[in-house]
């Protein structure tokens, strides 16, 4: 991917040798992967980057040529995800997730960020600093909201926010994020959405709204007008100077009130397999084109193979026109010994989506946003089984955009999976639509947009 030079005026105003980019990611794969891709591209384009991320990414950060700073891990993430999974009410589940995963860790991440910025200023006192954050890091929000500056700084660094997840800000045209309601555009529904937004702020989200204010105030934030009485999802995506929504507009609901700080820039393109790519033993059998390929993945976070991956293999076991590739999502992972693997299926512990999906006719997945976007950029229609975290919202967007079948459950039956796969294979509209959006995304040149924003805000400092 070659760098864009379509804004020479801005480019000429910035001395790149005097620019330091500090990238920030919360310690979860789905939030770190998109930032790591961007960090790698920035290094290739000649930028000096420090990356604050989970300890798990130390080696990968070094491999792409960036300086690494560890972010404190979640406190017992397994406990948190288990507790969240049993909360039936979507509003209450959203409230608990905001508190446990995002608001509570703010102080520790702020301390890590300030220490990193002060190190940068000591080592490179004359460099301009631009922050490249992502919506759920949150340790930068006190700084954005008027907290005292890190030592050595006389003004707040400019900040660009990467939003590599569904657009979840409050809107008159859609229900609150998490309620998984696809808007229908009617005046009656808009009135219903208005009431739902109000009820959530004073009801299920009241605790997280209050805690958000308390934590930010304790950490020195002073611009509380941007926080007072607001949904935390609105706050996290609008405190930086600009938010870059990492998808093409066609994947989101039609809204008349997109926040003025938000720019849709598309997703990064597929990544070519590295020269060191080692193909699994079944590779040539699968890619020879003699049968249609169905790729199945449970993702990397909510990994219970009995919920989707195993049922999908068995649902298609009698199809001699199909070969199934089941990606387990974790290096070294294996299915339990008692699980029978059908003769038309292959399993692999870990395999790049971008390596496998170009050969796929259907992608069956748990509707994680990262996997969903891999399906889009590779032009593969999907069967979406979203049941936890933000996955039902992602599946809704796939249905709305016309790129796949929404099973409306994270634990589909074999019959549901088979019907979804059959519908996609028999109806060309899904493939046609996903190819249209793939082309829309390619034309947006996401990485060039990220670089332009960096240069734009650096020039303003």
Curated annotation (Swiss-Prot):
Keywords: Glycosyltransferase, Transferase
GO molecular-function term, one example from the UniProt record: UDP-glycosyltransferase activity
Organism: Beauveria bassiana (strain ARSEF 2860)
Matches recorded under SUPFAM superfamilies: UDP-Glycosyltransferase/glycogen phosphorylase
Any Pfam family matching the protein: EryCIII-like_C
Protein's name according to its UniProt entry: UDP-glucosyltransferase 1
Enzyme Commission identifier(s): 2.4.1.-
Listed pathway(s): Secondary metabolite biosynthesis
InterPro entries in alphabetical order: EryCIII-like_C, UDP_glucos_trans
Free-text function comment from the UniProt entry: UDP-glucosyltransferase; part of the pathway that mediates the biosynthesis of tenellin-type 2-pyridones, iron-chelating compounds involved in iron stress tolerance, competition with the natural competitor fungus Metarhizium robertsii and insect hosts infection. Targets the N-OH hydroxyl residue of 15-hydroxytellenin (15-HT) to produce pyridovericin-N-O-(beta-D-glucopyranoside) which is further methylated by the methyltransferase MT1 to yield pyridovericin-N-O-(4-O-methyl-beta-D-glucopyranoside) (PMGP).
Inducing factors: Expression is positively regulated by the cluster-specific transcription factor tenR and is induced during cocultures with the natural competitor fungus Metarhizium robertsii.
Stated family: Belongs to the UDP-glycosyltransferase family.
Disruption phenotype: Impairs the production of detectable pyridovericin-N-O-(4-O-methyl-beta-D-glucopyranoside) (PMGP).
Chain ranges passing through the membrane: none
Gene3D superfamilies in UniProt: Glycogen Phosphorylase B
């Amino acid at each position: 991917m070659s760098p864009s030079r379509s804004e020479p005026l801005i480019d000429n105003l910035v001395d790149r040798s005097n620019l330091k980019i500090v990238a920030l990611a919360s310690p979860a794969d789905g939030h770190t992967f998109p930032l790591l891709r961007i960090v790698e591209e920035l290094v290739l384009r000649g930028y000096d980057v420090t990356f604050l991320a989970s300890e798990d990414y130390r080696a990968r950060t070094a491999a792409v040529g960036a300086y690494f700073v560890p972010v404190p891990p979640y406190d017992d993430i397994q406990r948190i995800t288990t507790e969240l999974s049993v909360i039936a009410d979507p509003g209450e589940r959203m409230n608990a997730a905001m508190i446990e995963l995002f608001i509570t860790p703010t102080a520790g991440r702020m301390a890590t960020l300030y220490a990193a910025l002060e190190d940068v200023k000591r080592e490179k006192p004359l460099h301009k600093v631009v922050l490249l954050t992502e919506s759920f890091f949150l340790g930068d929000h006190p700084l954005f909201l008027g907290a005292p500056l890190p030592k050595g700084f006389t003004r707040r660094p400019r900040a660009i926010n990467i939003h590599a997840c569904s657009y979840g800000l409050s809107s008159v045209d859609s229900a609150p994020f998490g309620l998984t309601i696809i808007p229908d555009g009617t005046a009656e529904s808009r009135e219903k959405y208005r009431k739902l937004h109000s009820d959530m702020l004073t009801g299920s989200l009241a605790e997280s709204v209050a805690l958000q204010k308390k934590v930010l105030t304790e950490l020195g934030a002073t611009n509380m007008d941007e926080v007072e009485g607001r949904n935390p999802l609105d706050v996290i995506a609008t405190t930086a100077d600009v938010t870059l929504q990492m998808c093409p507009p066609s994947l989101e609901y039609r809204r008349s009130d997109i926040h003025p700080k938000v720019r849709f820039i598309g997703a990064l393109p597929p990544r070519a397999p590295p020269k060191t790519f080692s193909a699994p033993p079944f590779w040539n059998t699968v890619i020879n084109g003699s049968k249609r390929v169905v790729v199945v993945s449970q993702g990397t976070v909510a990994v219970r193979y009995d919920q989707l991956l195993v049922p999908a293999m068995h649902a298609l076991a009698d199809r001699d026109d199909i070969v199934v590739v089941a990606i387990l999502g974790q290096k070294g992972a294996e299915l339990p010994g008692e699980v029978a693997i059908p003769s038309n299926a292959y399993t692999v512990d870990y395999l790049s989506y971008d390596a496998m999906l170009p050969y796929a006719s259907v992608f069956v997945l748990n509707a994680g946003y990262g996997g969903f976007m891999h399906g889009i950029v590779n032009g593969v229609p999907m069967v979406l089984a979203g049941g936890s975290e933000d996955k039902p919202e992602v599946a809704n967007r796939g249905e709305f955009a016309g790129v796949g079948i929404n099973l409306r459950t994270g634990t589909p039956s074999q019959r549901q999976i088979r019907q979804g796969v059959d519908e996609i294979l028999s109806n060309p509209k899904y493939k046609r639509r996903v190819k249209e959006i793939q082309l829309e995304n390619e034309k947006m040149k996401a990485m060039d947009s990220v670089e332009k924003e960096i240069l734009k805000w650096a020039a303003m400092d």
